[in-house]
Amino acid sequence: MLSHIYKKEMIDALRDRKTILLTILVPMIMMLGLVFFYESMLSDKGEQYTLAVGHSLPPALESKLNEIDEISVKTFAKPEEAVDEGKADAYLNVPKEFDSYVNSMTPFKVDVYGNSIDQGSSNAMQLVQSALDQYKNEIVQQRLTNKHIDQSVIQPFTIQQKEADEEKGTSAIMLSAILPMLILTSIVSGAMPIALDIMAGEKDRKSIEALLLTPVSRNKVLVGKWLAVSTFGVASGVFALVFLILSTVLFTENLKTAFQLGDHMWSVIGASALIIVLSALLISAMELFISIMSSSVKEAQSYMSLVVFLPVFPMFFIFSKAPNQFDLSYFLIPFLNLHALFKQLLFGMVDPATILSTSGTIAVLIAIFFLLARACFLKDKWVLPK
């Protein structure tokens, strides 16, 4: 009888176009948008910045700035106002006596004006600052050469910064932030329509009484409904993961480096599949419990909005942390553990202890919410329409 109930609920759900829309199309559109957004953040290609000046620059300095492909030097009558009005990204203020000051070794000041709050202006200021530093070093080196002084006198050592994981770097950080959020949000949105309809909807239609009058036990009815909701949650999560991987690998250049998992690939896939299934079972139990407690679909929808935000909040707590900084406590906090685990997996860190801790925490929550849903489902005051 359990299989018959499960099959009935699945058939009823698949007849609803809204279910298919929220299970497939909405996650697909959302993922495509976020993938291209984060890819554009990682890629600086095609970005052009306007550098305002008040007069012509010294030839050597102008040549140094022209070597930067992203910078276009433009003369304005009022360059500072041009930056304030958005006509230019930054303003370089150098004295007209630049060359004479350099030749006479007279110290002087160069101003780089911009708005660090604006990303374009901030990038332009950094590029100009870097070019000025290089040009300043060249002048110093030339002066030392003229005085027959070895450059090592003022440069005893050089500094070279290296990333711990240069191959993945920023792309893995970006994906580790959006991957768990997208998967969990897809599970929530995929399971929600059927969870709303399967209990609160039947109360609105007053069809729940007929189901309860059948000889099937309420426990089997509840399990059948829960498995049906979970199936849509799992399908949404798997589809979200597969589509995210495909869209990232096929349509991006920077983000796809995060999926270079090497020997850990199958371990990561297996752990991800386990977490998706457990997350779907948990979210489905939560949504089913809310649907049973609610007297109508409208009331259930207001409560469900709280569930939608659960996958998002943890991202802000771990975004700035490296995956090797998580202690065991991170994997015992619901939903935060999912974000932490996916971040470790994307960096190729497959730790059985963290996987078991996360799975165990989710399993305990599944049992709690299912038992709460069962306790309410066995009482007529929660099941029968008011």
Swiss-Prot record:
Induction text: Induced by ethanol and the protonophore carbonylcyanide p-chlorophenylhydrazone (CCCP) and, more modestly, by sodium and potassium. Positively regulated by the two-component regulatory system NatK/NatR.
Record's catalysed reaction(s): Na(+)(in) + ATP + H2O = Na(+)(out) + ADP + phosphate + H(+)
Top-rank EC class of the record's enzyme: translocase
EC numbers for this chain: 7.2.2.4
GO molecular function, one term: ABC-type sodium transporter activity
UniProt keyword NADP, yes or no: no
Keywords on record: Cell membrane, Ion transport, Membrane, Sodium, Sodium transport, Translocase, Transmembrane, Transmembrane helix, Transport
Protein's cellular compartments: Cell membrane
Pfam families cross-referenced by the UniProt entry: ABC2_membrane_3 (PF12698)
Major subcellular location class: membrane
Family annotation (InterPro entries): ABC2_TM
Signal sequence extent: none
Ranges annotated as spanning the membrane: 19-39, 172-192, 226-246, 273-293, 300-320, 353-373
Membrane topology classification: Multi-pass membrane protein
A single GO cellular-component term on record: plasma membrane
Function: Part of an ABC transporter that catalyzes ATP-dependent electrogenic sodium extrusion.
Quaternary structure, from the entry: The complex is composed of NatA and NatB.
Protein name: ABC transporter permease protein NatB
